[in-house]
Curated annotation (Swiss-Prot):
Compositionally biased region (Basic residues): 504-514
Superkingdom classification of source: Eukaryota
Localization of this protein: Nucleus; Nucleus, Nucleoplasm; Nucleus speckle; Cytoplasm
Modified residues (Phosphoserine): 494, 500, 511, 513, 525
Keywords associated with the record: Cytoplasm, mRNA processing, Nucleus, Phosphoprotein
Residues covered by the RRM domain: 81-161
Native source species: Gallus gallus
Residue stretches of biased makeup (Basic and acidic residues): 389-404, 489-503, 515-551
In-chain residues carrying the UniProt-annotated modification Phosphothreonine: 157
Biological process (GO), any one: protein heterotetramerization
Annotated protein name in UniProt: Cleavage and polyadenylation specificity factor subunit 6
Region (Disordered) location: 169-410, 477-551
Protein family: Belongs to the RRM CPSF6/7 family.
Length: 551
């Protein structure tokens, strides 16, 4: 029961007491859960997934304490049932999924783990959800597919390798189809499903709520339908974004409330709406959401921070333009070109992402004022900050053996290896000759080939004396091979006349072709000699003519 005691310590942070002998007596459920979850942990989706078995329940409790998620009533009784929930959009968060599950009357959620792409940390569209009772799992499998989540009906399946591979294949097909179509992945809707939650710095691919500007993904509609902004006006910290054209100035914030400044730029002026700008997910060629009003441009990923706030303008504002001015920073394509689709997530200076988002794909908040490098340039040596490769021991690449072979040998070691190679060579030649004289040419050839490979693999194979041994073995091998071919044809001739005649014809043909080949080369050499003789005669004639002229 040592394992059970360990699991009691692990789940102590959940805050629920349960009887160890009565309800947690066997290891079948834990072993089965480990076997089911181990492929997803080794799937290489995210580095933090490898040890999430030990940290899942504490992290769930911490998330409930930190964020503003709905109240979760844990009725954990020592039983855990894992389900896969798929057919989700890539911007679906754990809050969205929790709200959908709670709407069905299921309140014993133990964990929610999203599967993510290793390349960009983006959700693959399915998650692992653990509940604490069989009734909750049945209710999820029966009722959740009938609910609509971001315009799509979720798919609930048991947790096994078959459904995991199906969801993986579906996510790969979706990614490949999005890349081949050239449109990029559609942005999330305008925030109707997220307006019910306060801006809590959680979610997948969302910008922090402190940055003004309404929806930061003004892209085309995804599978969930066109974006709608029905509840954006409920957020007091964001002025509404008007239709294309010069919008009117919004009202000031309520008394006693201060607009928090954005993390990577100057604070927004309260007398004008935020300027529109193209963001990831907006297709190429789509006009901006409106003309640029005067004021500092918002930060754009990959172009550095904007230049500081402008001085107070006493006169008329400058004419609005369709594009924001380019801030100082590394040059790149025009701002109308959307960045590559593999760069989702918060901009530089955003708060840390949600627990199911890999934090290695986002820069720390401390570097919010430092211009980031251009995302379209060559990547650094290790863009994701992975540790150096660990030592694999006996299964490492052969480079270590080559390095060991390059190390200088002492005279005693050299002589020992050389004597061993000489013994191998002499014994192999004597055995091969005896086998060949007995007619066992296959064994003789195999002996010589093995001896040659052993000597070539030794540490002194580059030495001239070792090369002499190898050449002597190869000469012996060629002689035995030629002898074996001739004896084989004689044996065939003595056994079957038809085969011997065909072999004889082929040998005659080979001998004729060899003779023709030799004759051809002889004729070529004769031609060369003739040409040389002609050249010599010409040179002599020229020398004679020169001597005659000089006289």
């Amino acid at each position: 029961m040592a394992d059970g005691v360990d699991h009691i310590d692990i789940y102590a942070d959940v805050g629920e007491e349960f009887n160890q002998e009565a309800e947690y007596g066997g290891h079948d459920q834990i072993d089965l859960y480990d076997d089911v979850i181990s492929p997803s942990a080794n799937n290489g989706d995210a580095p933090e997934d490898r040890d999430y078995m030990d940290s899942l329940p504490p992290s769930v409790g911490d998330d409930v304490g930190k964020g503003a998620a709905p109240n979760v009533v844990y009725t954990y009784t020592g039983k855990r049932i894992a389900l896969y929930i798929g057919n989700l959009t890539w911007w679906t968060t754990d809050e969205d999924l929790t709200e959908a599950v709670h709407s069905l009357g299921v309140n014993d959620i133990l964990e929610i783990k999203f599967f993510e792409n290793r390349a960009n940390g983006q959700s693959k569209g399915f998650a692992l959800v653990g509940v604490g009772s069989e009734a909750s799992s049945k209710k999820l499998m029966d009722l959740l597919p009938k609910r609509e989540l971001h315009g799509q009906n979720p798919v609930v399946t048991p947790c096994n390798k078959q459904f995991l591979s199906q969801f993986e294949m579906q996510s790969r097909k979706t990614t490949q189809s999005g890349q081949m179509s050239g449109e990029g992945k559609a942005g999330p809707p305008g925030g109707s499903s997220r307006a019910a939650f306060p801006p809590s710095n959680r979610g997948r691919g969302r910008f922090p709520g402190a940055i003004p500007g309404g929806d930061r993904f003004p892209g085309p509609a995804g599978p969930g339908g066109p974006p709608h902004r029905s509840q954006l006006d409920k957020l007091p910290t964001r002025p509404p974004l008007g239709p294309p054209g010069p919008p009117g100035p919004p009202g000031p914030p309520p008394p006693g409330q201060v607009l928090p400044p954005p993390l990577a730029g100057p604070p927004n002026r309260g007398d004008r709406p935020p300027p529109p700008v193209l963001f990831p997910g907006q297709p190429f060629g789509q006009p901006p959401l409106g003309p640029l009003p005067p004021g500092p441009p918002p930060p754009v990923p990959g172009y550095g921070p904007p230049p500081g706030p402008p001085p107070p303008q006493q006169g008329p504002p400058p004419p609005p333009g369709p594009f924001p001015p380019r801030p100082p920073g590394p040059l790149g394509p025009p701002l109308t070109l959307a960045p590559p689709p593999h760069l989702p997530g918060p901009p530089p200076g955003a708060p840390p992402p949600a627990p199911h988002v890999n934090p290695a794909f986002f820069p720390p908040p401390a570097n919010s004022g430092i211009p980031t490098s251009d995302s379209r340039g060559p990547p650094p040596t290790d863009p994701y900050g992975r540790p150096p490769p660990y030592d694999r021991g006996d299964y490492g690449p052969p480079g270590r053996e080559m390095d060991a072979a390059r190390t200088p040998l002492s005279e005693a070691e050299f002589e020992e290896i050389m004597n061993r190679n000489r013994a191998i060579s002499s014994s192999a030649i004597s055995r091969a000759v005896s086998d060949a004289s007995a007619g066992d040419y296959g064994s003789a050839i195999e002996t010589l080939v093995t001896a040659i490979s052993l000597i070539k693999q030794s540490k002194v194979s580059a030495d001239d004396r070792c090369k002499v041994l190898i050449s002597s073995l190869q000469d012996c091998l060629h002689g035995i091979e030629s002898k074996s071919y001739g004896s084989g044809s004689r044996r065939e001739r003595s056994r079957e006349r038809d085969h011997s005649r065909s072999r004889e014809k082929s040998r005659r043909h080979k001998s004729r072709s060899r003779d023709r080949h030799d004759d051809y080369y002889r004729e070529r050499s004769r031609e060369r000699e003739r040409h040389r003789d002609r050249d010599r005669d010409r040179d002599r004639e020229r020398d004679r003519e020169r001597e005659y002229r000089h006289r």
